[in-house]
Swiss-Prot record:
It holds the Pfam family TSP_1. Glycosylated via C-mannosylation by dpy-19 at Trp-58 and Trp-61. InterPro entries: Compl_asym_regulator, TSP1_rpt, TSP1_rpt_sf. It is a single-pass membrane protein. This is Abnormal cell migration protein 21. The lineage of its organism: Eukaryota, Metazoa, Ecdysozoa, Nematoda, Chromadorea. Glycans are attached at W58, W61. GO terms for cellular component: plasma membrane. Signal peptide: none annotated. Its main location: membrane. The chain crosses the membrane at residues 240-260. Required for determination of left/right asymmetry in nervous system. Acts together with unc-40 to control an initial left-right asymmetric polarization of the Q neuroblasts. Mig-21 and unc-40 may control the asymmetry in Wnt signaling response by restricting posterior polarization to one of the 2 Q neuroblasts. Involved in left-side QL posterior migration. In right-side QR, unc-40 and mig-21 pathways mutually inhibit each other in posterior migration, allowing anterior QR migration. Coiled coil: none annotated. It is found in: Membrane.
Length: 306
């Protein structure tokens, strides 16, 4: 099978029986061609894919670029001819040191001016500043520089914050305020001040506390002439029990009294009956017995009394 030779630009290999030789006719890129003859002398051509390797070549160097930042450049391309299966050896870009001509406008390449003098100290920030300007297109670096003020450049100032709201703490109220004293950021002091005043309300009564023989409760009072500075704790004791203690005790007393009354009644009746039985004896004359102790003949025997 033959390949179209119009697209071929590489070398091909031609062989006379078993002998290969190079043909530079520009046909059969990447192909190999062999020729053999049979015993009758007839020619026979065969084609096969051949891994052809061809080194490439460099084009001519381009012109030098303009000098920028002390360097200029030029380039070349690996296409003369194009390599097959390999690359061109050597550098693609060449650099060379150069000097900027004095007639090149300065604005094309930026440069800094010298630093301006330091400004006066900004006591609010405790800093001072100096500046410089870029002449040209662009410059690397900062256009501002800062440093701390000296301790003697700013007067010492003290500032207070607003007071907080009053907060109740028992018999007194408290509020706070913060202050800051500074001459510069390296020498700063911070503090808190506190202010108190008497509360105009009595505290609520506490719960009842029970001890042997006494029940008491207490509350914190608004300070009087005796306890204005000391905030003395005043306790109030009550001679009456609270209702939730009095009701159970009252019920217990009623139940105990009822039981004691029945017990005493039974004991008294018991002794009374025995006393009557011991003081009366039986004799032949029924008239000597009380009428309620005389049992008529035939009456049922009831000895519950005895």
């Amino acid at each position: 099978m033959e390949r179209d030779s119009n697209t071929a630009k590489s070398e091909i290999f031609y062989s006379n029986p078993a002998i290969w030789r190079h043909l530079k006719d520009g046909k059969g890129e990447g192909m190999s061609k062999s020729e053999k003859r049979n015993k009758h002398g007839c020619r026979n051509f065969t084609y096969s894919i051949w891994n052809c390797i061809r080194p490439g070549g460099w084009s001519t160097w381009s012109k030098w670029s303009k000098c920028r930042e002390g360097i200029r450049k030029r380039r070349r391309t690996c296409n003369n001819p194009l390599p097959i299966g390999t690359t061109c050896s050597g550098q693609k870009v060449e650099k060379q040191s150069c000097a900027i001509s004095s007639n090149v406008p300065e604005y094309l390449f930026g440069s800094w001016t010298s630093w301006n003098p330091w400004s006066r100290c900004d006591c609010d920030r405790s800093l001072r500043i100096r500046t410089r300007h870029c002449k040209g297109n662009s410059c690397e670096g900062c256009d501002k520089d800062y440093e701390d003020c000296r301790p003697d450049e700013c007067p010492i100032s003290k500032k207070w914050s607003e007071w907080t709201d009053w907060v109740n703490y028992g018999i007194e109220q408290v509020r706070f305020s913060a202050w800051c004293s500074s001459s510069n950021v390296a020498n700063t002091e911070v503090g808190i001040r506190k202010e108190t005043q008497d509360s105009m309300k009595h505290a609520n009564w506490s719960e009842w506390h029970m001890h042997p023989g006494v029940a008491y409760r207490y509350r914190l009072l608004h300070n009087s002439s005796i306890s204005i500075e000391h905030h003395l704790l005043s306790r109030f004791t009550s001679s009456c029990l609270p209702l939730h203690f009095a009701i159970p005790i009252f019920c217990f007393c009623i139940l105990t009294g009822f039981l004691l009354q029945n017990i005493i009644y039974c004991v008294v009746n018991r002794f009374k009956r025995r006393f009557i039985r011991l003081n009366y004896s039986y004799d032949s004359n029924p008239r000597d017995y009380p009428s309620h102790l005389i049992r008529s003949p035939g009456s049922p025997k009831d000895e519950s009394f005895w």
